[in-house]
A protein has these predicted regions:
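A structural signal for short, hydrophobic/glycine-enriched beta-strand patches
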Residues: 1-142
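A transmembrane-helix-recognition feature enriched in membrane-embedded lipid enzymes
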Residues: 136-156
């Protein structure tokens, strides 16, 4: 629904493939979203990451590359000698300040947003998805250890 109401928004699906997984996390999300009506053109896949730090680092590179491609396509259209389209002097999505919503499990939002800021995402918004209530305490304890590790490693 959000993607339909916001057609200029791109959804970056980030996550690699584990040894026991038939497809990458990004590919699984892609299939789910397309099946549920999201336009494939709004989806960018990052399929190489194996950690939260890599999710955000590789996603940033993918976003920057995509924004540059959009700018280049616009410049190409504007430089076509016989183009019937008027010159585009308005802001397109690639020119607007980047706003990033990080959708992740509720226990993971804080660390993901802090890592995103460390990687240069300025306008970061956490969007939480509910976790399994039975596993929630276990996941929070594990996440605390990951926060300490990422602080020590300089990832956040």
């Amino acid at each position: 629904e959000y993607a339909e109401k916001n057609p200029e928004t791109y959804l970056v699906l980030s996550g690699g493939k584990g040894p026991d997984e038939p497809v990458s996390e990004a590919q699984a999300m892609y299939r789910y979203l397309v099946y549920n009506g999201v336009r494939p053109g709004q989806l960018l896949l990052e399929e190489h990451s194996v950690s939260t730090v890599e999710n955000l680092a590789y996603s940033k590179l993918l976003i920057e590359s995509h924004r540059e491609m959009i700018r280049h396509e616009r410049e190409e259209r504007n430089h076509l000698k016989f183009s019937r389209e008027p010159k585009e002097n308005y802001l397109i999505a690639a020119d607007k300040p980047l706003e990033v919503g990080v959708l992740t499990s509720n226990f993971h939002v804080y660390r993901a947003c802090m890592i995103a800021k460390k990687w240069g995402f300025e306008n970061v918004y956490g969007i939480s998805a509910q976790s399994d209530p039975v596993l929630f305490i276990h996941l929070c304890v594990r996440e605390c250890a990951s926060i300490i590790k990422d602080r020590i490693m300089g990832n956040m």
